[in-house]
Each structure stands twice: as structure tokens, then as C-alpha cells.
């Protein structure tokens, strides 16, 4: 007798096994095979973090289905032109329609074994005081009520007092200790630093070293490589990891077209070091 056995390390692994099975089935026939499949990279997915017109709700729903089918486990919501993600309205709750759409995205992400990470971008006008700490936690509570269980804070592409690494670390640790760890079912916090690539960094690593020293160890720190748009190399990973004292959370800017809007960038992938996984 022949049988089909799907086994995964957890519910998500079994879901991925089902995706493999669906691709093997052709004309109601199935080859006699044994497939052992596992990821070499922990976080696999997409950041919607570009400038310009954000994706439509329908496009995001299609994307989440695509991620599940292709065993991608992370979608980070952070479109720069969403005013409730960034300035001027990051302190305010989403209007009813947008809140309902986000709630649906969280639901569909879960159905496709994708972690929906909601990001906030407060750095351009944040005040380093208790009032804005409370504002940020209140916004996170609103998103938690919509079903979000993964969160990120972006300090990229800002200027002024918001770039202070000591203040950033104090705020992030406060969120970590008063929200993330309190909730029990929220995944580790992710942050995008102001100096998110090597070419923009202090050669001595002052900003990055401060984050590495002061941020709670569980907080993930994003990194785009030697430049904004860059190959990811083993040497580059070693450089950043030494400074932030944890494995970098790679935000690979490919394909990024918000600076070239008259055509699509669809070239092949090359240049990334296969040893970085």
C-alpha cells in the first residue's frame, strides 16, 4: 500500500509540507518520493517600506497568499506614505475603514503562516518624554486589539533629535519591557536604525555600538548592507554584528524602485554571499 505522509516540526512546517505536495501533484498523479525540506534563513519575506503610493488592500491580500505558497514567513507593514504609520499621525488610531483592512490582513497572514509585523515610524517628530512613550504604547495596544502580534519601530531616514541612539535605546527598551514582554504572545521587537548601512555609519561605529551596548538583547536590529542598495556579504555581516552584538536582521533592498519610478527593476539576483545564512 502507498500512502502520503506530511510531517512538520510544527504547524507552520506541516503547512509548508502541504505547499510542496500541491506542487508535486500533476493530473491527479504523484511521484513516489521522499522530500526533506527546511529553511536555512530564519526570517524570509517582504518589507513594504518604500516611498510613494502604498500597495492596495487587494494587492496585499494577494501578496500574503503568495508568501504562504512560497514558504515566506514574514510581512512587515511600513509604507512611508501611510500617515498613521509615520508623521504626522503616528500617535492617532487608524480610521475605521483602514483598521478593518489591517485586521483582515492580520487574519489572512495567519491563515498563510505569515507573521504580520506592523511598524511605526515616529522619529521625525517624537518627543523624548513620558507623554510620547504613552502615545506609542497606546498605538501598539490599538494594533494589538486588531490582532497584530509582531511589531517594529523604524528610525530610518530622519534628522534632528530623533536620531539620538541613547534615547532610541531607552524608548525601545521601555516598549520591550512594558509591552512586548508583558503580552507573552508578542514576538521580539524589531527596530530599523538611523544608520542602517555602512556608508552612512560613523567609521568608529559610535551610533551602532551604542545601540549594541544599550538595547535589550532580544531586540532585532535591521541592516541593508554596505549601502542602501547593496549585496550582502559575509565580511559586511561580520562588520555589523561586531558592533550591534547580535545577528543583523537583513532588510535587503531588492528590488527597490521608489527612486526609479519610470520602469520596473527586474534583473536577476546575484552577488549575495551564500555563507551568510
Feature-to-residue mapping (PLM):
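Feature activates predominantly on carbohydrate-active enzymes
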Residues: 2-132, 136-139, 145-149
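Catalytic-core regions of glycoside hydrolase
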Residues: 50, 139, 158-277
